Amino acid sequence: MESMSKIEAVLFDLDGTLLDSFPDFLASLENINVKSSSKKIDESVVRANVSDGSSKLLKLVFDIDTDDKAFDEHKRNFLNEYERNILMYGNLFLGVSDLLNFLLDKKIPYGIVTNKPRKYTEIILKKSSLLRQSKVVICCDDGFKSKPNPEGINHACNILGVPNSKCIYVGDHENDLNASLAAGTISGVCTFGYGFKKR
């Protein structure tokens, strides 16, 4: 790991890295499950796929394909529930507040590059004062290719005015690691998140 004296910025993934959003996702899935099915939800499946997007999550939890007639309704209902549940049950992971406060104290700018849509990310920012102090936030629908493509990380570094080689990117998914490597940033792997399966 580079010494902190060489680090000019830190960028983070959101779900599974800064934010434990699993409880919000689980509550949302359980709410639509009550309305549409009696199938018991496997929490381990939800936790293991939180970082893979809502479509994959719905396919696995409800055993439904994206071309199924009911899929669009399931997804719409889930996203409506999730919007209501954002940070109702989830929170920053243990230690994240201390880390972000440390970066603020050291005047090291931090930001977020996430595959989460802007609509939901903005709700999270409004509810978290520490995340709201991010100097840059790049979302999947901001016009850049999603991770593992490095476009979002590259743009974030440009906004911060920091060379990629002087920036750390931290994530919990292989897409995060691959995006970081492609961007030429220093890579940080968050093993307590959802994306990296136990090997």
Show the residue positions of the predicted features:
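N-terminal helical cap/lid subdomain that shapes the substrate entry/recognition surface
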Residues: S5-L14, L18-D98, F102, K106, ...
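Generic enzyme active-site microenvironment
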Residues: L11-D13, V113, V170
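Conserved short alpha-helix immediately C-terminal to the canonical SAM/SAH-binding motif I
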Residues: L18, F25, Y120-T121, G152, ...
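Substrate-recognition/cap helix-loop segment adjacent to the acidic, metal-dependent catalytic center
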Residues: V34-S36, L57-D65, Y89, S97, ...
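Residue-level detector of anion-binding/catalytic polar loops
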Residues: K39, P109, I186
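Short acidic capping loops at alpha-helix termini that bridge into adjacent secondary structure
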Residues: I41-V45, K69-A70, R132-V136, N164-I168
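Acidic, Mg2+-coordinating phosphoryl-transfer loop and its flanking beta/alpha structural elements
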Residues: I168-R199
